[in-house]
Amino acid sequence: MQPIVWLLGGAIALLVVVIRAAWTYGHRNQDMPSGPPTLPFIGNAHLIPKSYTHIQFTAWARQYGGLYMLKVGNSNMAVVTDRRIVKEVLDSKSSLYSHRPHSFVSHELITQGDHLLVMHYGPKWRTFRRLVHQHLMESMVDSQHLPIVNAEAIQLVRDYMLDPEHHMAHPKRFSNSITNSIVFGIRTADRHGSNMNRLYTLMEQWSEIMETGATPPVDIFPWLKRLPEALFGHYVTRARAIGAQMETLYEDILQRVEKRRSGGVHLDTFMDRVIASQDRNQLPRHQLAFIGGVLMEGGSDTSSSLTLAIVQALTLHPEVQRKAHAEIDAVVGHARSPVWDDLARLPYINMIIKEGHRWRPILPLCFPHALGQDDWVDGKFLPKGTMVVVNTWGMHMDPDHRLNQKYDPAKFVPERFAEHPALAPEYVPGAWENRDHYGYGVSRRICPGIHLAERNMFLAIAKLLWAFEFQPGPEGEPCDSDPVTGYQHGFLYCAKPYSTRPVLRSESIRETVEREFALAQREVFSTFTEG
């Protein structure tokens, strides 16, 4: 009998251990930041929405504070919705917080780890970042890239003027053409450009699958990989298809650049410089294709999405347009369009752009960071490997922040930035209390194209407001700016198709547009091939 008793006792003890482990697995430790109640084993995985995640994350921030912890299985996700913590932790301890969490979907199925957005922090990331910075530093942008931006911005106005029906496509062509001209020497002459349309189809799919919660947590529960992917929306098949599209597009464009160079035509583009320095950098073929492709992605989708959001806001706020028109008319007139040198004399345009960043940020949640080693924040423990998500949406919509104390954070009110006359890069290194917005990200992962993007946005919005009054479309055609029903889900945030009617403000403006467009064709566009 005694062996049976021992066996029974051992089985009971093992069962107790298993039950205890299952009960504690998925629960946060007491020294961690608080958060929503957890369930055994799964933690908070059942609570994280598959779309518009930033809305729920912001609701939790109001309940649990500017730093709270979600548990996904036994893994940790810290959500930061506090400007002070962003500055004192992610910015000041950037060497700890600049890592990326490993992702089976993004690293193994789609990018093979060669995409700058998801790339792990290390020598490869530093090489990519150095090459990008050299070509997009502020002095380079002003000396070499600004004429391209100005020329493409006048075509943007002309596109709205001649083809108002397809107004949703024109900002996409504008930003894609600037980026491709600078990166490859290949501009996008019209909205039918094959490279552009391939890219935006790819980006829509990439954005949807990479949104927090959109795929099963296979990095936390590896056994989920063994289950039929049909249970999870065929995520593996979708991810591999996205990766194949990405590789094919980036390789196709790289080959066009190489073919041009082999014919003796060497330009001063980003990829020309990278290829010329291959003896020193020795980038493998996949990385060589991706370094240009990633720049094409980043420059194409962000400026276009923000332009579309601002035009939508202008359509819904004629009082903002009236104030902008008065400022532009007093400074510029109708015989020429606004240029970059007008920035200091057009402060209200700068306010409109900042408010666009705040009101509808292109990345409502910054792409997740990962903690490189254990850390303590405000007396709370964050273990090594914690995924850190910066909730840009929540910070921008915080009713207690001084930018929002006078004006409703849900409303589009450029005047809230009256005390922020400088460009966004000037506020990044300063005091957290005075930062304007987080549209370009944080820490060492901040957008490397920030200087180019600021010029893209100023020239696009200034010229569009100089030329047009944006009126509502025909009755019954919606201009829905609701953050859920009016915007596409995904980690990139873009307005769904909406109605607007760009009304030219004078015939003299039409003449100016045609004259400046003809000049752009002769002096800028003729430099590049088309694609």
From Swiss-Prot:
Enzyme class: oxidoreductase
Pathway(s): Secondary metabolite biosynthesis
Cofactor dependency: heme
Key word Iron present: yes
Domain of life of the source: Eukaryota
Keyword Oxidoreductase part of the UniProt annotation: yes
Alphabetic keyword roster: Endoplasmic reticulum, Heme, Iron, Membrane, Metal-binding, Monooxygenase, Oxidoreductase, Transmembrane, Transmembrane helix
GO cellular component: endoplasmic reticulum membrane
Membrane topology: Single-pass membrane protein
One Gene Ontology term of the molecular function aspect: iron ion binding
PANTHER family: CYTOCHROME P450 MONOOXYGENASE ALNH-RELATED, P450, PUTATIVE (EUROFUNG)-RELATED-RELATED
Stated family: Belongs to the cytochrome P450 family.
Designated name of the protein: Cytochrome P450 monooxygenase acuC
Organism: Aspergillus aculeatus (strain ATCC 16872 / CBS 172.66 / WB 5094)
